[in-house]
């Protein structure tokens, strides 16, 4: 029986701790922060942190259907560079509380949950955002809406869709596969977005947050929350965020992989933003959608030198 609480009328599930024991390459002490949100009341967010407490802050946001485990190869590299690297789990993922109903997940709620984590609970300032997949869909909104909190931005295989441009066929295949799957094989989905082969133990680590289907409302909800038409509930806010990013001069390093058909079209859009102009933007070669798996240390080195330049 899952550990269940009710917050603001929302049923929240919590993954038992023993699911997270002895995960390969992930021996960071778990930390928790509580946020109070209008949507769900008190929600516990899990995160890991590495590096000196007084170092420049890098906030690493994962996406669908992963969790902070995705950043295990990057955290030590960033920490060794003197950076305070913080990787939270989105609500519904990892060690964070999981609203049990797909309908409890909205784009706006995810932006608010991460805002409350980063700014209310941890009071982070002069942050460099690193966002991949939904980590960028959420994180770029935070940068646009709270620019005073950010020193730099590193979008990696991500974007800010408004529904005004079409999504690639490969994305629709993923969307439909998630919608139709009776059992959502999280480890398989992560593997399908990697060039390197994950070990069985690594795949199991991606399955760890979800003991059964009941826990998977987050991964089930996310594809349908991406704005794909101009009348999507998040379109207006994302258009406003894009307009804001078009006026902000916060330094931006666009760090995409060479083999991600899902997000490749967003790279030129981001590189045209004022914060990205006149900068050498790295390409992480031999890496798929989950470039943290395929080229994590290389991406971390690029981020560290970018942070040093700020």
Residue ranges and their predicted role:
Residues 125-164:
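Conserved hydrolase catalytic core segment
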Residues 162-222, 226, 230-234, 239:
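Helix-rich cap/lid subdomain of alpha/beta-hydrolase
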Residues 3-34:
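An N-terminal hydrophobic leader/cap segment in hydrolases
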Residues 35-43, 48, 80, 87-131, ...:
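Active-site loop/oxyanion-hole signature of alpha/beta-hydrolase fold enzymes
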Residues 49-95:
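Conserved HGGG/HGGXW glycine-rich cap/lid loop of the alpha/beta-hydrolase fold
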Residues 277-310:
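Catalytic active-site module of serine/aspartate enzymes centered on a nucleophile-bearing elbow/loop
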Residues 251-287:
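Conserved loop-alpha-helix segment in the C-terminal half of the alpha/beta-hydrolase fold
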Residues 24, 65-76, 95-98, 164, ...:
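Short N-terminal helix/helix-N-cap motif within the alpha/beta-hydrolase-1
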């Amino acid at each position: 029986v899952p550990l269940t609480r009710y917050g603001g009328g929302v049923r929240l599930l919590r993954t038992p701790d023993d699911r997270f024991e002895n995960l390969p390459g992930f021996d960071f002490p778990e930390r928790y922060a509580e946020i109070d949100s209008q949507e769900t009341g008190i929600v516990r967010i899990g995160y890991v942190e590495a590096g000196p407490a007084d170092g420049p802050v890098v906030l690493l946001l994962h996406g669908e259907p992963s969790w902070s485990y995705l950043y295990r190869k990057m955290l030590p590299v960033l920490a060794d560079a003197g950076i305070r690297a913080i990787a939270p789990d989105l609500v519904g993922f990892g060690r964070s509380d999981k609203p049990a109903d797909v309908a409890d997940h909205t784009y706006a709620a995810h932006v608010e949950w991460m805002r409350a984590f980063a700014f209310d609970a941890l009071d982070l300032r002069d942050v460099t955002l690193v966002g991949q997949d939904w980590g960028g869909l959420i994180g770029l909104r935070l940068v646009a809406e709270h620019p005073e909190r950010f020193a730099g931005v590193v979008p990696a295989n991500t974007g800010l869709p408004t529904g005004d441009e079409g999504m690639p066929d490969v994305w629709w295949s993923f969307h439909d596969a998630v919608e139709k799957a009776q059992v959502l094989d999280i480890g398989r989905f992560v593997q399908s977005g990697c060039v390197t082969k994950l070990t069985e133990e690594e795949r199991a680590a991606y399955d760890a947050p979800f003991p059964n289907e009941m826990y998977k409302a987050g991964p089930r909800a996310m594809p349908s929350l991406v704005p794909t038409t101009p009348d999507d509930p998040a379109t207006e806010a994302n258009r406003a965020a894009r307009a804001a990013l078009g006026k902000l001069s916060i330094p931006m390093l666009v760090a995409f992989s060479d083999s991600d058909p899902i997000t490749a079209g967003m790279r030129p859009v981001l590189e045209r933003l004022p914060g990205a102009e006149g900068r050498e933007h790295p390409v992480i070669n031999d890496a798929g959608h989950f470039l943290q798996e395929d080229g994590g240390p290389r991406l971390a080195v690029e981020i560290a030198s970018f942070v040093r330049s700020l």
